Regions:
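N-terminal secretory signal peptides that target proteins for export/translocation
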Residues: 1-3
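Enrichment for repetitive, rod-forming helical segments
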Residues: 12-13, 59
Length: 148
């Protein structure tokens, strides 16, 4: 085989392997403890583009007190969808100081956009109904290491 063809075949195999690796849930991201009032959240932290793009895709279950905190470099309008996401989720768009800007609920396997009402750096996903069951709404403040 010509050396260039070997290189192309190797590159294709590496890309195929990388793509296959995204077919499973992310379970080993760093974690942070967040609180609001007496409620404690054990949140996985997605900071890289790849981690944020995968998010909670492919998860079949998630304990009630767990979630995922998406951290972006700069505040901007953040929009989320539910492609390849099997769990119904609630999403909180969060200001730099931990104040929830707005909330939404998202249905599994849908492509509807759920967007922040203003530019934010943080987005917290929890099981659907988690925020409403705890009386948490826009204006509620989250406490924890990421927030100033």
């Amino acid at each position: 085989m010509h050396p260039m063809k070997k290189y192309i075949a190797l590159a294709a195999a590496v890309l195929a392997f990388a793509a296959a690796a995204q077919d499973g849930p992310q379970l080993n991201l760093p974690r942070v403890k967040l609180t609001t009032g007496m409620h404690v959240i054990d949140a996985q932290v997605a900071t890289t583009t790849e981690q944020r793009m995968t998010g909670l895709m492919f998860r079949q279950e998630m304990p009630q007190q767990e979630g995922m905190l998406f951290v972006f470099e700069y505040p901007s309008q953040q929009c989320f969808w539910m492609k390849n996401t099997l769990l119904p989720l609630a999403v909180a768009f969060v200001d730099d100081d931990g104040t929830i800007v707005n909330l939404d609920e998202m249905q599994p396997q849908t492509l509807n956009s759920h967007c922040s009402a203003k530019p934010v750096r943080y987005v917290l996903e929890m099981n659907k109904g988690w925020f409403s069951k705890k009386g948490i709404k826009a204006g509620t403040k989250l406490e924890g290491p990421p927030f100033k």
